[in-house]
């Protein structure tokens, strides 16, 4: 990241560790090893597993609109532990209420050094607590009129299913998140900075996540 306000990690096998997993690692470390408490603020496109971990520790997870300015405002005005967004911007209350990728990397290194465990081992321990999951995203470039048509269909709840995946509920904090089953969901949202329609998904495995994204893409482009 050009100005180092975001963080990305790779494990020992060279596999990318996304921001959703980094946020979970930071929450666990700050609570269990640093004794820090407070609310966790995350953007609408972050994994819902964050709430599961917060529930485990008896702390609150508040979901904000997408954009770190919304998270920053909440962290300043309320007692906070951490704020994070899907794009890798994370802040912790023991530092400043603003994104700092270098600081987050140092905290993760400290976590690994103190426990003597690898990233994979630490992530597996979190999976043992809240269940495994995978997140992914498609960025679909399309004409503006097609993008607006899809968003209008979301507004009027036209999408009842995406292929074999039946919609059981909808959340509309910032975009349209369609709840599926077993902690799975898919979210449709126009980019605020590029001529794109972003489609996010969460499921138990990477393969299932891609299957949901493919089914959603086929449905909205039909």
What are these regions (language model features)?
Residues 12-13, 36-202, 206-222:
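Phosphate-binding and adjacent anionic-ligand microenvironments
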Residues 16-37, 65-67:
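Short, acidic/small-residue loops that bind anionic groups at enzyme active sites
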Residues 2-6, 88:
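Short, glycine/acidic-enriched loop or turn micro-motifs at the edges of active sites
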Residues 1-2, 189:
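Short beta-strand segments
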Residues 5-25, 50-51:
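Short Gly/Thr/Asp-enriched flexible loops that form oxyanion-binding sites at enzyme active sites
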């Amino acid at each position: 990241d050009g100005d180092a306000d975001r963080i990305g990690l790779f494990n020992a096998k060279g596999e990318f560790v996304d921001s959703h997993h980094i946020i979970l690692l930071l929450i666990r470390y700050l609570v269990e090893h640093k004794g820090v408490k407070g609310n966790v603020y995350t953007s609408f496109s972050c994994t819902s597993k964050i709430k599961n971990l917060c529930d485990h520790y008896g702390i609150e997870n508040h979901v904000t609109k997408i954009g770190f300015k919304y998270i920053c405002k909440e962290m300043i005005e309320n007692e906070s532990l951490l704020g994070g967004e899907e794009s890798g911007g994370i802040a912790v209350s023991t530092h400043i209420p603003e994104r700092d990728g270098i600081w987050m990397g140092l905290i993760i290194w400290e976590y690994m050094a103190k426990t003597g465990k690898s990233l994979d081992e630490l992530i597996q321990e979190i999976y043992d607590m809240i269940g495994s999951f995978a997140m992914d995203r498609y960025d679909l470039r399309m004409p503006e009129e097609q993008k607006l048509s899809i968003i209008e269909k979301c507004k009027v709840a036209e999408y009842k299913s995406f292929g074999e995946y039946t919609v059981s509920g909808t959340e509309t904090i910032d975009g349209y998140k369609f709840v599926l089953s077993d902690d799975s969901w898919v979210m449709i949202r126009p980019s605020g900075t590029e001529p794109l329609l972003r489609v996010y998904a969460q499921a138990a495995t990477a393969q299932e996540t891609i299957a949901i994204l493919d089914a959603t893409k086929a449905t909205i482009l039909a």
